[in-house]
Amino acid sequence: MIRRIVGKTLGLLGYTIQYGCIAHCAFEYIGEVVICSGPSMEPTIRNYDVLLCDNLSRHFFSIHKGDIIVAKSPDKPSVNICKRVIGLEGDKVCMSSPSALLKRHTYVPKGHVWLEGDNLDNSTDSRSYGPVPYALIRGRICLRVWPLESFGPLKESPNGRIQDNWP
């Protein structure tokens, strides 16, 4: 009797561990659901929007200018950030806010990207902490799933910061 209960308990524990490992691999390497908080990506992404993040992108496809990505924060590695890619390695990017009279530029180093929020006045991004290493990128946002009235792919940058060549 006890042997049968122990056997069933161990079997259930084994299945739980298996499914836990499968779920971990799926969320880590294939994709995950992300709930965004904070105003840095408004109006494109609002507080508590639910997004689908494609984690395969970082392994098999190139990250492009204009993509919205999820990355580990360079300042706080335990926190994920959701920002738009403004520059790729070798690109010249503007470090100043759009309202600044004197514009400062820099080049994105090899193996890094330049990230900015769409709400430039209320975003802590590469203008604060500098270029972000590719290794910190977790995935690319591909779809908004909630709220349902906004279901679908995300819009282009509303502030026009993505340019091929800065003056």
From Swiss-Prot:
Looking up CDD domains in the UniProt record yields: S26_SPase_I
Gene Ontology CC: mitochondrial inner membrane
Output one GO MF annotation.
serine-type endopeptidase activity
List, alphabetically, the Gene3D superfamilies matched. Answer: Umud Fragment, subunit A
Q: Where does this polypeptide localize?
A: Mitochondrion inner membrane
The active-site annotation reads: 40, 83
Domain of life, per the record?
A: Eukaryota
Primary location: mitochondrion
Which InterPro entries does the entry link to?
LexA/Signal_pep-like_sf, Mito_IMP1_subunit, Pept_S26A_signal_pept_1, Peptidase_S26
Entry's Gene Ontology BP terms: signal peptide processing
* Alphabetical keyword list: Hydrolase, Membrane, Mitochondrion, Mitochondrion inner membrane, Protease
Q: Does the keyword ATP-binding apply?
A: no
Enzyme Commission number: 3.4.21.-
Protein purpose:
Catalyzes the removal of transit peptides required for the targeting of proteins from the mitochondrial matrix, across the inner membrane, into the inter-membrane space.
Could you give the subunit structure recorded for this chain?
Heterodimer of 2 subunits, IMMPL1 and IMMPL2.
Sequence similarity: Belongs to the peptidase S26 family. IMP1 subfamily.
Q: How is this protein named in the record?
A: Mitochondrial inner membrane protease subunit 1
Q: Which organism is it from?
A: Xenopus tropicalis
Q: What is the lineage of its organism?
A: Eukaryota, Metazoa, Chordata, Craniata, Vertebrata
